[in-house]
Design a protein with these regions (language model features):
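Exported/periplasmic ABC-transporter solute-binding proteins
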Residues: 48-51, 56-86, 90-91, 105, ...
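C-terminal motif of bacterial Sec signal peptides marking the signal peptidase cleavage site
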Residues: 42-45
Length: 308
């Protein structure tokens, strides 16, 4: 009896199912379609969430707060720092670097008078010393008692060389500083040099002292430039027979170097760098750190700088 009841119930359910399918012939396909659509929407939602997260991360990098960084640097660094700024965009795309290239003396004057500057790179320690608060008690190095730089950030970044460069063809057949000294004494040469308030001019004064030359007495044989770029241009244009410039500027201008000054003649040519006190110390320090990387140093060294 129980078996007959179960069999009857089974046939009854099958009959109901067939009746339902005859009444709604497309219902099975509809249910399959709805199930498929539900699966598609579920996958799309997961994908959208992942994409949103990725997009947010990407936009977070791209939309990082923009920083305008002002860098004052010696004119002799124009080519190298311009190239490095392009490289730095790959590392910090939100940082916009504005350079002010000139003689270190002029840059120091501008900074001491309140010019907006976040990072200073000088062609000599003299200008950096004059704004270093750690030297405030040394009136010879910091005569105005300025305290403008973040002392812990100060480094000796690079070393350069002072050279004797000649224009194309070397019309005076100049070969050395020794020969130049004799030509100057005889008034047989026109020499381009930097003004006394710029580092390259100050190194030249030391060279004159080394050879016992009186600059005032050589007035008719000297022509001056406000920075090393101006001196370099005078040599390139052959408006002077030779010029005392940095090795890096001679390289960048394609000039022939006939001699290099020794440390006994003018001392070391050190380029110190430091972050200035202000609102952008962190960004300035980050860029200064980048200048010490292998990538940046390879650019400096390619034109004749030596890493320190």
């Amino acid at each position: 009896v129980l078996a007959r009841s179960c069999i009857a119930a089974l046939f009854n359910e099958r009959a109901k199912k067939k009746k339902f399918e005859r009444k709604y012939p497309n219902m099975k396909k509809l249910l399959s379609l709805l199930l498929a659509l539900a699966l598609v929407f579920s996958l799309a939602a997961c994908s959208s969430k992942t994409d949103d997260t990725t997009t947010d991360d990407t936009q977070g990098d791209a939309n990082a707060e923009s920083v305008d960084l002002v860098v004052f640097a010696a004119a002799s660094m124009t080519e190298t720092l311009t190239q490095i700024a392009e490289m730095y965009k790959e590392v910090a795309p939100n940082v916009n670097i504005t350079y002010n290239f000139d003689s270190s003396g002029k840059l120091f004057t501008q900074i001491s008078e309140g010019a907006d500057c976040d990072l200073f790179i000088s062609a000599a320690p003299k200008q950096m010393n004059a704004m270093d608060g750690s030297l405030i008690d040394d009136k010879d190095k910091n005569p105005d008692g300025l305290d403008l730089i973040v002392t812990d950030s100060r480094i000796d970044l690079l070393e350069n060389k002072v050279t004797l460069a000649v224009p194309e063809g070397n019309p005076k057949s100049i070969e050395s500083f020794d020969q130049l000294a004799e030509l100057l004494k005889n008034g047989d040469v026109m020499l381009a040099i930097g003004n006394s308030d710029v580092p390259v001019g100050q190194y030249t004064e030391k060279i004159f002292a080394y050879y016992g030359l009186d600059e005032a007495a050589l007035a008719d044989s000297l022509t001056y430039g406000n920075n090393v770029k101006e001196v370099t241009t005078q040599v390139s244009e052959a408006s002077a027979d030779c010029g005392i410039i940095y090795a890096t500027d001679a390289y960048s201008a394609g000039l022939t170097v006939v001699d290099s000054a020794t440390t006994e003649m003018c001392g070391q040519v050190i380029y110190p760098a430091a972050v200035l006190k202000g609102e952008k110390e962190e960004a300035a320090q980050a860029f200064l750190d980048y200048l010490q990387t292998a990538d940046a140093m390879s650019v400096f060294e390619s034109v004749g700088f030596t890493a320190l």
